[in-house]
């Protein structure tokens, strides 16, 4: 059994179909990427995964439990595209606030705040107000918050949007450290360089899963030398039924 199973997911908003019969399996411990342009259905898919949206048809199971499940949702860390931080509070106060929301025991809370701040390299900035943080620091603080309750599954929606290349590399280094501890990570991105760092990818276009496999497999099957070229290849109508790589 796969850790995450998505079966025949369909979703529409009015007449606009945003997901069209999406089927995906993700094993435990994998860093899995959802790659596609804006409007391809990536955010809708992750919101269905975490129980924020209910699909019109199909289902998602995580750890063998059908979503939405409150028990499973407590095991998920989610980082949205926009930062939900209290700018007038310090980084430490933000972490403490969310630690209480996650019901982390008081005896463990202080230690966990230090641990997550260290993972994202913000220890030296914990007592500064969030309003003084750079954009990259705010993204890293959001990542720290999503890690507070030690989730089994981390879902990140465009975590490096609007961030300069140097800080993007720093966040990816953080993600690799988190994965090394056994956490399953699902990340959405439209940046090819980031997608290449994932273990496997699902390519989405207009709500349709057009290809799936490792970056190397996708390039090999498409006969191209880059992920961008592979994505363009699989976007052709004649290729969309041939894009699954095991």
Locate each region found by the language model.
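Helix-to-loop junction immediately C-terminal to a conserved catalytic motif
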Residues: 50
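ABC ATPase "signature
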Residues: 212-213
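Conserved ABC transporter NBD signature motif
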Residues: 58-74
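Catalytic Walker B motif of ABC-type/P-loop ATPase nucleotide-binding domains
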Residues: 154-158
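Conserved ABC ATPase "signature" region
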Residues: 96, 100, 107-125
């Amino acid at each position: 059994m796969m850790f995450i199973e998505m079966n025949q997911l369909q979703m529409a908003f009015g007449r606009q179909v945003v997901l069209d019969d999406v089927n995906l399996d993700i094993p435990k411990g994998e860093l899995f990427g959802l790659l596609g342009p804006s409007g391809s259905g990536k955010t809708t898919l992750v919101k269905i995964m975490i129980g924020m949206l209910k699909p019109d048809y199909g289902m998602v199971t995580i750890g063998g439990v059908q979503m939405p499940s409150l028990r499973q949702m407590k095991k998920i860390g989610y980082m949205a595209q926009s930062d939900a931080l209290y700018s007038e509070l310090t980084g430490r106060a933000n972490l403490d606030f969310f630690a209480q929301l996650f019901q982390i025991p008081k005896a463990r809370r202080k230690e966990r705040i230090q641990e997550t701040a260290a993972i994202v390299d913000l220890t030296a900035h914990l007592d500064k107000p969030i309003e003084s943080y750079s954009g990259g620091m705010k993204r890293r603080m959001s990542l720290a918050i999503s890690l507070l309750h030690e989730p089994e599954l981390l879902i990140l929606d465009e975590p490096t949007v609007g961030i300069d290349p140097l800080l993007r590399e720093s966040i990816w280094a953080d993600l690799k450290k988190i994965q090394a501890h056994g956490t399953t990570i699902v990340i959405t991105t439209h940046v090819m360089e980031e997608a290449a760092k994932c273990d496997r990818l699902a390519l989405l276009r207009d709500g349709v899963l057009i290809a799936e496999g490792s970056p190397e497999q996708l390039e090999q099957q498409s006969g191209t030398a880059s992920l961008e070229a592979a994505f363009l290849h699989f976007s052709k109508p004649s290729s969309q039924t041939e894009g699954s790589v095991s």
